[in-house]
Swiss-Prot record:
Mode of membrane association: Single-pass membrane protein
Organism lineage string: Eukaryota, Viridiplantae, Streptophyta, Embryophyta, Tracheophyta
Tissue: Mostly expressed in inflorescence bolt, flower buds and siliques, and, to a lower extent, in roots, seedlings and leaves.
Amino-acid positions noted as binding ATP in the UniProt annotation, renumbered to this chain: 286-294, 308
Annotated compartments: Cell membrane
Cellular-component GO terms for this entry: plasma membrane
This protein's name: Proline-rich receptor-like protein kinase PERK1
SMART domains the UniProt entry points to: S_TKc
A Gene Ontology BP annotation from the UniProt entry: response to wounding
Family, similarity comment: Belongs to the protein kinase superfamily. Ser/Thr protein kinase family.
Chain intervals with Polar residues compositional bias: 203-213, 605-616
Ranges annotated as biased composition (Low complexity): 113-137
Biased composition (Pro residues): 8-19, 26-112, 216-236
Active site (catalytic residues): 404 (proton acceptor)
Length: 652
């Protein structure tokens, strides 16, 4: 090989160039190069260097596949000791220079162990090896970095999934709602639960690489990738519910199995309600009426409820049942009876209400042998029920018209707070239609004149009925007196002249309940009298809104505001002949006489003399004192219907 002499000539220039490379690339080789700089002066060793140089070329290819040797390079770098030149020389130093000369690989292995060569190769070719070592180290570092990142991602996902699984288990075990066990089951094993568990197992099997685990501890600090848990939204949905709609119901966090009709109340099976009411036994019967029965029940959780069971052949049926459920699902107010759940099983339709334990206004005001109700209690009940109706009319969207306001539909708790009940006859009136013509359903004695005659339905019809309730609280009388069948005056017509005198002269004699004596606040009495007079006006458009009634009863508004639109000096607005009306007065009187004779002339009265069954409920309870011959009737299309075993409301 003639090439041997040429290297002999070149060695002198080569030494300066390599040092520059070595210094630029890696500091460790540079440290080893200074001592050998003195050796290049001797040419004889150079041939040996040539012989040695080709052999290392063979280590080049073998050194590439195993990444382990580079690991050995890193430890020697920190060691400044003279032993360092020995370690770098064997594998890596010759990597860049030898790729061009592959023919000498065979001789490489035997020559590498030679101990004489280490000096010269380190001097002549340390710089190129440094470059190659850089290439190897960077590739390895990149690979390690990528592997570490992948491991981090997998491990964080596994940790998040494990936490999520634990949380889900805890939530499922913490579910406290007892009544509908079947619905709660689907939650735990529902679409969200099953998919999540499968997903967790799938991801858990993913991290099978063993070497990856070694880098696990360092990556843990970068736990910020918490954002990858978008899958958890399903459990959040389960916890909420509610919402629905009782956004009510934010207070009620129980599960929302009953989304069938679009609200977050609870569904019950017929068997559950049958067990709760002891088979709908007579002992648990709270009342009955034209549309069905009301039974008291106790849920497995111990909560008392009132179960309203609709009669199969009643006018309410499926259509009105679904309308009622849809309406009540949007209502939540302290002065309105709350719906707890419902049941639809075949032809069976049941509603589950909260149980209000202290009966109703009719029982406490007109019940036989009941103590006289104090004035402060009467005012409290009037104000509470007015707030409940105001909520229905003005705070619900669309507004809700009750259509059957009466004393037996105002339930009383032990604190004598009023709760308006029975939305079975309620209807929704959209803002686009100012009135809705429907079947006439209401209780005789409370019907607004325009409603009883034509079926025109507005929220002002409820205002009229509430005015009748106020007159009951003021006078202690019933809406209709069945004992005087041929007397034309109802409670409203009898009270009109007295309301006129009381509003002008402040004289409540003959109007206020004589059983109270004079134990009432005259200013509060004046406010209630003014409200009652305004509510029972013939003209529906001249009746105030329920929110105005609330403010007037609270004393937060002038009583003159109740007379908006009335001509000054026309005090006869309270009389039967005041001003122009939307409903002809003579026609009103004729209709009332006709309705009254139909109601009282077709009913037979018992003589038991005791107040029948204590409670009324949700508009379905038969209440009445037979000795006084009460006669309240459910009306439909002007036809009076008997309700059997009593009468579905107050009368007389």
């Amino acid at each position: 090989m003639s090439t041997a002499p040429s290297p002999g000539t070149t060695p002198s220039p080569s030494p300066p160039s390599p040092p520059t490379n070595s210094t630029t690339t890696t500091p460790p080789p540079a440290a080893s190069s200074p001592p050998p700089t003195t050796t290049p002066s001797s040419p004889p060793p150079s041939p040996s260097t040539n012989s040695t140089s080709p052999p290392p070329s063979s280590p080049l290819p073998p050194s590439l596949p195993p990444p382990s040797p580079p690991g050995s390079l890193t430890p020697p770098l920190p060691q400044p000791s003279p032993s360092a030149p020995i370690t770098p020389s064997p594998p890596s130093p010759t990597t860049p220079s030898n790729p061009r000369s592959p023919p000498s690989p065979n001789q490489g292995p035997p020559n590498t162990p030679s101990g004489s060569t280490p000096r010269t190769p380190s001097n002549t070719k340390p710089s190129p090896p440094s470059d190659s070592s850089d290439g190897l180290s960077t590739g390895v570092v990149v690979g390690i970095a990528i592997g570490g990142v992948a491991i981090l991602v997998i491990l964080t996902l596994i940790c998040l999934l494990c936490k999520k699984k634990r949380r889900r288990r805890h939530d499922d075990e913490a579910a406290y709602y007892v009544p509908p066990p079947p619905p709660s089951g689907p939650k735990a094993g529902g679409p969200y639960g099953g998919q999540q568990q499968y997903w967790q197992q799938q991801n858990a099997s993913r991290p099978s690489d063993n070497h990856v685990v070694t880098s696990l501890p360092p990556p843990k600090p970068p736990s910020p990738p918490r954002k990858p848990p978008p899958p958890p939204p399903p459990p959040a949905f389960m916890s909420s519910s509610g919402g629905s709609d009782y956004s009510d119901l934010p207070v009620l966090p129980p599960p929302s199995p009953g989304l069938v009709l679009g609200f977050s109340k609870s569904t019950f099976t017929y068997e559950e309600l049958s067990r709760a009411t002891n088979g709908f036994s007579e002992a648990n019967l709270l009342g009955q009426g034209g549309f069905g029965y009301v039974h008291k029940g106790i849920l497995p959780s111990g909560k008392e409820v009132a179960v309203k069971q609709l009669k199969a052949g009643s006018g309410q049926g499926e259509r009105e049942f679904q309308a009622e459920v849809e309406i009540i699902s949007r209502v939540h107010h302290r002065h309105l009876v709350s719906l707890i759940g419902y049941c639809m099983a075949g032809v069976q339709r049941l509603l589950v209400y909260e149980f209000v334990p202290n009966n109703n206004l009719e029982f406490h005001l007109h019940g036989k042998g009941r103590p006289t109700m104090e004035w402060s209690t009467r005012l409290k009940i009037a104000l509470g029920s007015a707030k409940g109706l105001s909520y229905l009319h003005e705070d619900c969207n669309p507004k809700i018209i009750h259509r059957d306001i009466k004393a037996s539909n105002i339930l009383i708790d032990f604190k004598f707070e009023a709760k308006v009940a029975d939305f079975g006859l309620a209807k929704i009136a959209s803002d686009t239609n100012t009135h809705v013509s429907t079947r006439v359903m209401g209780t005789f004695g409370y019907l607004a004149p325009e409603y009883a005659a034509s079926g025109k339905l507005t929220e002002k019809s409820d205002v009229f009925s509430f005015g009748v309730v106020l007159l009951e609280l003021i006078t202690g009388r019933r809406p209709v007196d069945a004992n005087n069948v041929y007397v034309d005056d109802s409670l409203v017509d009898w009270a009109r002249p007295l309301l006129n005198r009381a509003s002008e002269e402040g004289d409540f004699e003959g109007l206020a309940d004589s059983k109270m004596g004079n134990e009432y606040d005259r200013e509060e009495m004046a406010r209630m009298v003014a409200c009652a007079a305004a509510c029972v006006r013939h003209s529906a458009r001249r009746r105030p809104r329920m929110s105005q009634i609330v403010r007037a009863l609270e004393g937060n508004v002038s009583l003159s505001d109740l007379n908006e639109g009335m001509r000054p000096g026309h005090s006869n607005v309270y009389s039967s002949y005041g001003g122009s009306t939307d409903y002809d007065t003579s026609q009103y009187n004729d209709d009332m006489i006709k309705f009254r004779k139909m109601a009282l002339g077709t009913q037979e009265y018992g003589t038991t003399g005791e107040y029948s069954n204590p409670t009324s409920d949700y508009g379905l309870y038969p209440s009445g004192s037979s000795s006084e011959g009460q006669a309240t009737r459910e009306m439909e299309m002007g036809k009076i219907k008997k309700t059997g075993q009593g009468y579905s409301g107050p009368s007389l």
